[in-house]
């Protein structure tokens, strides 16, 4: 009886939702709506209210028949208002950095009212507040700098850019040298994303202010390295791509950073970490050269597949993470294997997340206090 009642209620809810979606949109009368933190300066929408509801509006072509909103990979049917504009009011399916697109008769279109970020192309995204993740909010603490650093790559035959975070005290303590973390992005991003989307600098500032992290330098390089004549249209795992990065990273990027920044140039004070493809780089290049990197962080980038390559005399920590909706059992098994072989290894599983930025922000937050101790 209870089963039939629940099914009837579910069917009634679906019917009401469908009927509501098909009707004319009636704008809310409450004036408690305000622009979101991700709404473009000139735009009126999206808006958010105190109940955490988000209001999206889009002017589709007059010929549009079927309009939906894709919000954090969940589709919501849109309604037209009296002026012919399409509207959706919905609560966010997930917290953190989320994709928003309009689907107009099957075509996916960025929301023109939102800021654009780069991830496998330019996308409209929105930042959904997460009270339990306050560690990446800007606070009244000393702030470091993020510097745009250029160096010439003979391997590529062109100038390359890296972003370098230096702690707040860096310029005021010219005689001090610092540990360094080389932090890599994923296949869909570039060297800007760890600071722009991942909030790496803010996370480091807050942890340093709490005395949970030794002041450090963070270097963010681009994963992609192409020799002259290489097919740039190939995907990240193209022939020799990994080897190209390895050579550039070890023979050009590292020496250049050590020549221009006051880093401590030994394995005990050098870490490597990355998300997704950057985690795969850490698990290959970092592991193969564990004589150079004492601290390794693999975020949603697989696991250490060949522990025999790890140097027991230099490796201080192997840290593997993923979202709970990815492959936590595989990580936990690999970490147990590494511990059995005598390595200091640890894992972290981000609750309720998948292959996404909230997983990687949390992973960095968990990783940083463990290194250079």
What are these language model-derived features?
Residues 8-17:
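Bacterial N-terminal signal peptides
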Residues 22-75, 80-373:
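Non-catalytic cap/lid and distal C-terminal segments of serine-dependent acyl enzymes
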């Amino acid at each position: 009886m209870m089963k039939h009642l629940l099914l009837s209620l579910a069917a009634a809810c679906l019917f009401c939702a469908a009927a509501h979606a098909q009707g004319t949109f009636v704008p809310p009368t409450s004036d408690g709506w305000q622009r979101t933190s991700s709404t473009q300066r000139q735009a009126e929408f999206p808006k958010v209210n105190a109940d955490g509801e988000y209001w999206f509006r889009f002017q589709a072509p007059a010929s549009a028949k079927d309009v939906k909103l894709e919000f954090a990979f969940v589709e919501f049917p849109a309604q037209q208002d009296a002026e012919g504009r399409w509207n959706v009011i919905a609560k966010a399916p997930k917290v953190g950095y989320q994709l928003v697109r309009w689907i107009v008769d099957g075509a996916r279109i960025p929301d023109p009212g939102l800021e654009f970020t780069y991830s496998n192309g330019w996308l409209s995204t929105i930042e959904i507040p997460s009270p339990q993740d306050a560690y990446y909010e800007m606070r009244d603490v000393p702030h470091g700098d993020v510097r745009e650093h250029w160096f010439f790559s003979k391997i590529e035959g062109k100038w390359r850019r890296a972003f370098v975070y230096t702690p707040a005290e860096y310029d005021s303590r010219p005689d001090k040298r610092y540990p360094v973390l080389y932090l890599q992005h994923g296949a869909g991003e570039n060297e800007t994303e760890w600071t722009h989307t991942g909030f790496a600098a803010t996370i480091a500032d807050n942890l340093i202010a709490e005395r949970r992290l030794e002041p450090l330098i963070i270097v963010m390089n681009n994963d992609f390295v192409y020799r002259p004549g290489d097919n740039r249209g190939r995907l990240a795992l193209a022939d020799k791509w990994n080897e190209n990065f390895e050579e550039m990273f070890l023979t050009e990027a590292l020496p250049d950073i050590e020549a221009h920044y006051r880093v401590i140039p030994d394995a005990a004070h050098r870490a490597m970490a990355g998300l997704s493809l950057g985690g795969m780089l850490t698990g290959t290049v970092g592991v193969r050269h564990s004589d150079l990197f004492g601290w390794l962080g693999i975020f949603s980038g697989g696991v250490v597949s060949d522990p025999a390559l790890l140097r027991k005399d230099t490796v201080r920590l192997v840290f593997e993470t993923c979202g709970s909706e990815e492959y936590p059992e595989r990580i936990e098994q690999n970490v147990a294997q590494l511990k059995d072989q005598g390595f200091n290894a640890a894992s972290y599983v981000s609750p309720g997340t998948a292959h996404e930025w909230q997983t990687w922000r949390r992973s960095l937050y968990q990783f940083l206090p463990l290194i250079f101790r």
